[in-house]
Amino acid sequence: MNMHEPLTGLFHSSRLMILNFADIPADTPPVENLQRFFEDCEKRGLNPRLPENRQKFNNHLLERSRVRYLVSRYGEDRKGMLTGSKIASQGRTLHMGVDIFCRDLETVYAPCDAAIVRTGREPGDQGYGYYVVLKPDNLPGIHFFFGQLSKDLPGVGPIKAGQPIARLGDFIHGENGGWSRHLHLQMVKTIPREPDPPAL
């Protein structure tokens, strides 16, 4: 099943850019090319993995591109980008969801009628931070995982399409796991026991 099929209204009328980090031309300016951004930061003695530096990169690309969202591709191999991170040490470099990057701490809405079946937090840096798991009413055996949220999470129970779930978490104090501002969205079939996060 295509992840976007049950989410037909999620990106409707939104201004977005689909990112494929591996295909960004090598001769684009450093601020628009993630690999060259990393190299340029390191030359200047800056840490490109700090979320505040990544957020500056995202904000500039959003402004230059005149879009509201940057959306990563499903199934990306991010080994190069995650070298030395906790995620890489756990073998979690293949990105099994989509990331939706933005400038502000936007509200996340339920894409369909569903039940909130679990909320939680993956502690530490370079994790999912606060998260919510939805069980859609019309998709048996499927759950939606929303990660990188704020600490103000909803309670478990039913939710209608279009109702707010939470807001995006900030990188300040590691609320969202220590990343630039974005939503991690993933479909999962099984939910492991706590405290393991239900996504990869």
Predicted regions and their residues:
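Short, glycine/small-residue-enriched coil/turn segments at secondary-structure junctions
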Residues: 88-124
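Small beta-barrel nucleic-acid-binding modules, principally OB-folds
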Residues: 91-92, 96-100, 145, 189, ...
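Extracellular structured ligand-interaction cores
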Residues: 95-97, 105, 129-131, 143, ...
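Short, well-structured beta-strand-loop connectors
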Residues: 107-118, 155-169
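Acidic, glycine-rich catalytic/binding loops that coordinate metals and/or anionic ligands
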Residues: 2-41, 157-173, 178-200
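Polar/charged, compositionally biased leader and regulatory segments
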Residues: 1-99
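A residue-level detector for short acidic-glycine micro-motifs
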Residues: 102, 118, 148-151, 170, ...
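Zn2+-dependent peptidoglycan hydrolase active-site motif and core
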Residues: 110-150
